[in-house]
Amino acid sequence: LHVLVGGLGLGYTAREALRSERVARVDVVEFLPPVIDWLARGLVPLAAELQADARFAVTEGDVYQRLASPPAQRYDVILIDVDNSPDEQLGDANASFYTETGLTLAKQHLAENGVLAVWSYADSATFERALRRVFREVRVEPVHFENGVVGEAETNWLFFARG
């Protein structure tokens, strides 16, 4: 499987993808050069583990611009972990990804039966409707967990789409 990850962060999403023996390659697109520098200098907690895996690659760029452009290759899985939620983006330019048009462009980057997964801290009926207009199969999963930092239960959301 070939996996595209939007956003490096602390590297946990990439590491989880690399745990599968079925994964041949994980390409991470990170917008912020300092985050890539932290990885190179070993300041990201998973830096050594990620950099030791020959299947891992990180490039600087805007994953949303990449997904809006004609595909250079197709991915079996696209994991987006960039914005706070479809309704609360980190930058105004990101908003177009969450629309029917943006999702149609992103879908072109998926291999046949490929899966798009988007993390969010909040549910979004508007985004779910856009996904359902573009993809054959859509599933929205709440993820309940105890946030040890703030000492309370939280719910995040995963949006899955295929076909």
Annotate each PLM feature:
Residues L1-E112, V118-W119, R129, R139, ...:
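The AdoMet/dcAdoMet-binding core of the Class I SAM-like
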Residues Y121-D123:
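Active-site beta-loop-alpha junctions enriched in small/polar residues
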Residues A161-G163:
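Active-site beta-strand termini and strand-to-loop segments that position acidic
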Residues T126, N147-G148:
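Generic structural signal for helix capping and beta-alpha/helix-loop junctions
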